[in-house]
Amino acid sequence: MSPIGSPDNVWLKPLRFEVALTVYLATLAWFAGWLPQGVTTTRWYRIYSACVVWAIAAEIIWIGGAASLGIASHFNESSPILGWTYRLMGGLAVLLTSSALVYGILILRNPNSRLDPAFKLSVGLGLVLTFVLTVAVAGYMANSGGHFVGISSTNAPGAPLMGWARDHGDLRVPHFFATHAMHFIPAFGFLAALALPHRRRTAPPLASAPSSPSSSPTRLARR
C-alpha cells in the first residue's frame, strides 16, 4: 500500500523493517554460538554471510528510499522499473531469510551440541519454519498483489504500531508469526526442557552466545 494517503506516518514502515531486521540479525548472532565448531571460519560461510548482510542493506535502503519519495516499496507495479525493483527486492528477501534455514539445519546436525535435546530441536525447527512459513506467506501476498483479505466495511484505523487491519483480513498477521517462529518455538522448547524432570540438570545454556565476534554474520561481512 502506498504511503501517499495512508493514515500511518510515512516513516513507520521503514522503522518497523529496521527493528525487525535488527532483531533478526541479533538472534542469528546469538544462535551462531550453537553452530558446529569451525563452521564460521569456513570460506563458504564468510561469503554467504556477506551476501546476506548486503541483501539486508539493500532492503533497508530501498524501503527507506521509497518512503522518502512517497512511493510504495511493496506491490508497486506502477512502472516497469518499480515492478522490476520490487521483484528484485523479493529475491533478496528470500536470500536473507534463507540464513534462518541454513542455521537451523547446521544446529540440528551438530553432533557435538551441548544443548538439551528438546531445546536443540525447538531451535532448529523454529529456524527452519521461519524460512518455510515466511516465504510461503510472502509469496502468497506477492501473487495476490497485497496483504489485505476482503474489503473494509468500516474504514477503522489499523492496530497501533503494527498497522494491521481490524475490520477485515490482513496477511501481515501470519507473516509476523512466521518470521518470529525462530523466537516463539525455541521459547516453548526452553520451557519444555525445564519442565521435564529428567532434563533439569541439562537445561539449555542460554548464556552460550558466540564468545567471539567472528561468529556474527555482520562481523564477517565487514572482513
Residue ranges of predicted features:
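Juxtamembrane membrane-water interface segments of multi-pass membrane proteins
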Residues: M1-P7, L25-Y48, L106-L121, M141-G145, ...
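Hydrophobic cores of alpha-helical transmembrane segments in multi-pass integral membrane proteins
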Residues: M1-S2, L12-W34, Y48-S68, L88-Y103, ...
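Non-cytosolic membrane-interface motifs at loop->transmembrane helix junctions
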Residues: G5-L15, F75-L88, P117-L121
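Helix-loop junctions on the outward
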Residues: P36-V39, A66-S78
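Long hydrophobic alpha-helical segments that form multi-pass transmembrane helix bundles
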Residues: S98-V135, G139-A156
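Membrane-interfacial catalytic/cofactor-binding modules of polytopic membrane enzymes
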Residues: Y140-M182
